[in-house]
Amino acid sequence: MPKQNLHPKWYAEAKVYCDGQLIMTIGSTKSELNVDIWSGNHPFYTGSQKMLDTEGRVERFMRKYGLKENNS
């Protein structure tokens, strides 16, 4: 006898949001998904170069190893 209620609930129309804006609908085990980056705003696909440093990782690395940024 197989176990009952083993598989998660499947949402065929799960909504994907990026910055509060509806991006697409997909099938998922969650009814809503929130993403930070998707192909519409990723630099590889858009051709733009921008640096996402949400936690100050670059500055922390520079301080840790005593490096200074030279803008010249």
Curated annotation (Swiss-Prot):
Protein name according to UniProt: Large ribosomal subunit protein bL31c
Any GO MF annotation of the entry: structural constituent of ribosome
UniProt-listed SUPFAM superfamilies: L28p-like
GO BP of this protein: translation
Annotated Gene3D superfamilies: Ribosomal protein L31
Role summary: Binds the 23S rRNA.
Coarse class of the protein's main subcellular location: plastid
One Gene Ontology cellular component: ribosome
InterPro entries referenced in this protein's UniProt entry, alphabetically: Ribosomal_bL28/bL31-like_sf (IPR034704), Ribosomal_bL31 (IPR002150), Ribosomal_bL31_A (IPR027491), Ribosomal_bL31_sf (IPR042105)
Family: Belongs to the bacterial ribosomal protein bL31 family. Type A subfamily.
UniProt keyword rRNA-binding present: yes
Any Pfam family hit: Ribosomal_L31
Compartments reported by the entry: Plastid, Chloroplast
The entry's keywords: Chloroplast, Plastid, Ribonucleoprotein, Ribosomal protein, RNA-binding, rRNA-binding
SUBUNIT field: Part of the 50S ribosomal subunit.
Record-linked HAMAP family: Ribosomal_bL31_1
